[in-house]
A protein has these predicted regions:
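Active-site helical microenvironments for divalent-metal-assisted chemistry
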Residues: 1-170
Length: 170
């Protein structure tokens, strides 16, 4: 079984759905489509890690696999990215994605890219389905950009930040 199938299978085994009724592979494919659109922004090594991490970005958070499981199935670089984008424990969204969480993303090569792939896919789907999540993402986008270091450490990903912001303005 290849890594893409393995990632999808882990979500299937835990009955994990996207928007309550879609197989989770739907979201992973959307995130991968974003990766394919922007992979030219990455160097070759990071491109390989991010390509794998996009498929596995929710594994540790949403399925019954550990960092070591991910490392053994994908590789250490992808596992480090997936670990970085995994929400912290918390009682609400703000606690799960606090300063420490975003610091870990900023400090892990490739993690900002993968987080942007995930967020863009979620916003695209939210816009298409008229989900209430779309408005939440729109409201928090300015802070999200700051947390990810748009104007400081991640200027090379500017086309992704612009694309995301434009989704809210179309």
């Amino acid at each position: 079984m290849g890594y893409v199938d393995w990632c999808i299978e882990q979500h299937r085994k835990t009955n994990h759905y996207y928007d309550k009724y879609l197989p989770y592979g739907f979201h992973l494919r959307m995130a991968n489509n974003v990766y394919e659109d922007f992979q030219h922004l990455l160097d070759e090594e990071l491109n390989d890690y991010c390509g794998k991490a996009v498929w596995g970005h929710d594994l540790i958070e949403d399925t019954r696999v550990s960092y070591n499981d991910v490392k053994n199935q994908l590789d250490e670089g992808a596992a480090d990215i997936i670990y970085a984008v995994t929400n912290d424990k918390g009682k609400n969204r703000k606690e799960r994605a606090g300063d420490k969480y975003y610091e870990g993303i900023r400090n892990t090569p490739g993690a900002v890219f993968v987080k942007l792939c995930d967020r863009i896919a979620n916003v695209q789907y939210g816009k298409m389905s008229k989900s209430r999540m779309f408005e939440m993402y729109k409201k928090e986008n300015s802070d999200f950009e700051q947390y990810l270091g748009r104007y400081t450490s991640n200027k090379d990903l500017e086309p992704m930040f612009v694309y995301l912001k434009n989704l809210f303005n179309e």
